A protein has these predicted regions:
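Structural signal for interior beta-strand "rungs" in well-ordered beta-sheet cores
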Residues: 139-241
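Short alpha-helical
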Residues: 56, 120-121, 151
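Phosphate-bearing ligand-interacting subdomains
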Residues: 82-145
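Hydrophobic, well-ordered beta-alpha structural blocks that scaffold small-molecule cofactor pockets
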Residues: 11-87, 102-105
């Protein structure tokens, strides 16, 4: 399913690379390369957006949507901890738990941003929603840059100043923090968290659900395995993280 893209003409959905988990198996796509080109949403039509997670990441995702000029299309937040939260975030209501969103998906289509900080939980929720027919919005802040020949999975969020260079590939539901860089030919697995100021070097490979800390770096052709956490300021220059 082509990525639903906000405010960026240069995102494609796809997966490649034999040695890295670009997308979770449950969310794998068999879309031919010829059909992989990004399809923009027509925001002149009625498009409704739901954000899963009303915490810090949810606020960041909302900020990206507001910057893209579609804040009025956001239905609200869904969070299993909604009872303990205030009733709204920046004027956007917290509508209920994820179960309520699942029920709504059975009635009408909604574009979803899964803004859960924990990588594993984010993918688990996304896969459950995908099985119910959810479509995922790939949200790129106007001040971020994504090359026209990069590949970005659906559900990713790119904060201000994030950069994705030519022929880089990111799996679904990744987060790119402010001023993070994914350099040319690099591959990043599904559900990975790339913190502010992090640099993934040329032809580096980062597995699924990894966490790259603030101002960390992954050297040219270096490898970070799935589920590995790279601490802030750390440099990885060898295979296996």
């Amino acid at each position: 399913m082509p990525a639903r893209v906000l405010n960026c003409k240069s995102i494609r959905l796809g997966s490649y690379g034999e040695k890295i988990e670009i997308r979770e198996p449950e969310a794998a796509t068999s879309t031919p390369e010829s059909e992989v080109e990004m399809q923009r949403i027509n925001f002149d039509e009625e498009v409704r957006v739901a954000i899963v997670g009303a915490g810090g990441y949810g606020r960041v995702a909302l900020d990206v949507l507001l910057a893209g000029g579609i804040g009025d299309r956001v239905l609200g937040f869904y969070d299993d901890a909604h009872a303990a939260l205030s009733g709204e975030v920046r004027g956007v209501p917290i509508l209920g738990d994820v179960g309520m969103l699942k029920s709504m998906l059975s009635v009408e289509p909604v574009h979803v941003v899964v803004a859960i900080t924990d990588n594993g939980a984010r993918l688990q929720v996304a896969n459950a929603l995908r099985s119910l027919g959810a479509r995922f919005l790939t949200s790129v802040h106007p001040e971020a840059y994504v090359s026209a020949v990069a590949v970005v999975g659906d559900g990713c969020v790119a904060a201000p100043g994030a950069i994705v260079q030519p022929d880089a590939a990111l799996g679904s539901h990744c987060f790119l923090g402010p001023r993070s860089v994914v350099d040319r030919d690099a591959e990043v697995g599904a559900g990975t968290w790339i913190s502010a100021g992090c640099v993934v070097g040329p032809a580096a490979r980062v597995g699924a659900r990894a966490v790259l800390g603030q101002n960390s770096s992954v050297g040219r052709k270096a490898v970070v395995d799935s589920d590995v956490e790279v601490g802030a300021l750390r440099h990885v220059d060898r295979e296996g993280g």
